[in-house]
């Protein structure tokens, strides 16, 4: 009986060691020991077992981050999303990566390329709609007040010097922009949502004659 119990226990141990969770544990241990090739092998084996779960991709990205290769870590997520464009958890993992590595501006680009409504709904708090201008760009013979708005809750920032605005370099939009002098003015604007994620830059050019 004791032998049977031992065999069962050993079988459970082996099963765990070869399970998804077991591969993750081995992978992170290898990362901590700077054994990156071994870590990659373990995380790849975990992905083979279940490619839909984000944990192993996070582990693969950690291999690159541990070597100060942020671009390599980013490629892990983008490649996974390319093959699984409807995987909500992968998108969330990629967003977490961008936020943790202080690259919130890349979240907007990631979600702009997403065509799956379920994914967009699951990460709706991160979605940042680009601003809209009224009136539209063009040539006018009289003074114009340019209104900038967005359906996204957050702050609008703009520039009139031809540079792309950021929350640090742009002017915070508080009231319509008055164009009263003759000449051409390019207004560029973004929205920064409550998560600190900026939208894409929208540019409109106005000429007052």
Regions found by a protein language model. Name each.
Residues 1-22:
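Long, contiguous interaction/recruitment modules in multidomain scaffold/adaptor proteins
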């Amino acid at each position: 009986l004791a032998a049977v119990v031992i065999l069962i226990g050993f079988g459970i141990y082996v099963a765990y060691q070869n399970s998804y969770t077991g591969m993750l544990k081995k992978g992170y241990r290898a990362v901590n020991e700077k054994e990156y090739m071994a870590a990659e092998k373990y995380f790849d084996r975990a992905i083979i077992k279940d490619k839909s779960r984000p944990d192993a991709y996070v582990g693969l990205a950690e291999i690159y981050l541990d070597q100060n290769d942020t671009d390599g870590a980013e490629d892990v997520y983008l490649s996974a999303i390319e093959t699984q464009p409807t995987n909500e958890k992968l998108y969330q993992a990629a967003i977490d990566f961008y936020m943790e590595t202080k690259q919130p501006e890349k979240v907007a680009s990631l979600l702009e390329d997403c065509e799956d409504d379920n994914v967009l709904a699951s990460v709706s708090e991160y979605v940042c709609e680009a601003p809209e201008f009224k009136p539209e760009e063009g040539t006018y013979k009289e003074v114009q007040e340019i209104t900038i708005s967005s359906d996204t809750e957050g702050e609008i920032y703009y520039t009139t010097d031809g540079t792309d605005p950021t929350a640090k370099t742009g002017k915070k939009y508080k009231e319509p922009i008055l164009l009263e002098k003759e000449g051409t003015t390019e207004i560029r604007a973004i929205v920064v949502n409550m998560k600190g994620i900026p939208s894409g830059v929208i540019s409109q050019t106005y000429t007052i004659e």
